């Protein structure tokens, strides 16, 4: 079992070498055909801003595009992510994709428990803990996604929900294994509503304290926490000013080269 950050070159090359580095991951969800992805990346990879050492840029295409996207970005600073995986490494699980398959084609990181996986496909915290372990076992950095629904927020249950998601989701995490968190309030995803930056900072600080209590102070300090939920260029700067926001998980705005670059440019000048 992989338990040491130094044991995997994927981990050391993806995670920040300095605390000032900032993540921006574009989640394409179930969008783009092969030809559309090729057109996007041929325009995108030539952009000079992607060489900014303070920004770690990643794309998260559908499974069908991972290999072809990797061929285009393999000699660039862009990192490759997957949208989910199965918790078992191989077997009779028709339609599923395993961590060894993803690792073999050059995937650097994988989303675990995106809100659409939780709420549309009914993925539960315990199974997500197993998925996180599968990623770690195969040298892929897991991005554990957490967040509350509108009903839970209005009931004042946000912290209780996040505490449960973190406690169970990280329960199988090996000592010293690296991971990333992504806070994505369900009520802000694809709705055009973005959480108030002060609220985002408060929640990210809460999550960091939970990691400190569950694992260690060192883990809390080195774990990047991203924000996701209707991220666009016009709200990026305010989010980057939050001290506990270490990056952004971008959805719809990552489907266009122009809008994705506009976000990256806002990060660069922040």
Curated annotation (Swiss-Prot):
Alphabetic keyword roster: Cytoplasm, Gluconeogenesis, Glycolysis, Isomerase
Name of the top EC class for this enzyme: isomerase
Pathway listed: Carbohydrate biosynthesis; gluconeogenesis; Carbohydrate degradation; glycolysis; D-glyceraldehyde 3-phosphate from glycerone phosphate: step 1/1
Superkingdom of source: Bacteria
Residue numbers binding substrate: 27-29, 190, 230, 251-252
Single annotated GO MF: triose-phosphate isomerase activity
Cell compartment(s), UniProt: Cytoplasm
Catalysed reaction equations from the record: D-glyceraldehyde 3-phosphate = dihydroxyacetone phosphate
Pfam annotation, one family: TIM
EC number(s) on file: 5.3.1.1
Gene Ontology cellular component terms for the protein in this record: cytosol
Catalytic-site annotation from UniProt: 114 (electrophile), 184 (proton acceptor)
Biological processes per GO annotation: gluconeogenesis; glyceraldehyde-3-phosphate biosynthetic process; glycerol catabolic process; glycolytic process
Family statement drawn from the similarity comment of this UniProt entry: Belongs to the triosephosphate isomerase family.
Quaternary structure and partners: Homodimer.
Role this protein plays: Involved in the gluconeogenesis. Catalyzes stereospecifically the conversion of dihydroxyacetone phosphate (DHAP) to D-glyceraldehyde-3-phosphate (G3P).
NCBIfam families for this protein: tim
Name of this protein: Triosephosphate isomerase
Species annotation: Chlamydia muridarum (strain MoPn / Nigg)
């Amino acid at each position: 079992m992989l338990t040491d950050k130094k044991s995997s070159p994927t981990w050391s090359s993806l995670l920040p070498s300095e605390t000032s580095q900032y993540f921006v991951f574009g989640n394409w969800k179930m969008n783009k055909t092969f030809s559309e992805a090729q057109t996007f990346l041929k325009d995108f990879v030539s952009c000079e801003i992607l060489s900014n050492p303070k920004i770690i840029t990643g794309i998260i295409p559908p499974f069908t595009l991972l290999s072809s996207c990797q061929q285009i970005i393999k000699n660039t600073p862009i990192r490759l992510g997957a949208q989910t995986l199965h918790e078992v490494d191989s077997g009779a699980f028709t339609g599923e994709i395993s961590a060894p398959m993803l690792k073999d084609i050059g995937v650097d990181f994988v989303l675990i428990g995106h809100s659409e996986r939780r709420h549309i496909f009914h993925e539960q915290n315990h199974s997500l803990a197993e998925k996180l372990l599968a990623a770690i076992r195969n040298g892929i950095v897991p991005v554990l996604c957490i967040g509350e629904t509108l009903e839970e927020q209005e009931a004042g249950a946000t912290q209780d929900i996040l505490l449960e998601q973190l406690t169970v989701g990280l329960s199988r995490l090996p000592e010293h294994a690296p991971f990333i968190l992504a806070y994505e309030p369900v009520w802000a995803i694809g709705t055009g509503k973005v959480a108030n930056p002060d609220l985002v900072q408060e929640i990210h600080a809460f999550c960091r304290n939970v990691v400190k209590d569950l694992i260690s102070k060192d883990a809390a300090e080195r774990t990047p926490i991203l924000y996701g939920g209707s991220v666009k260029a016009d709200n990026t700067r305010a989010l980057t000013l939050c001290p506990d926001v270490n990056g952004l998980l971008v959805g719809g705005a990552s489907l266009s080269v122009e809008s994705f670059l506009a976000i990256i440019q806002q990060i660069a000048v922040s």
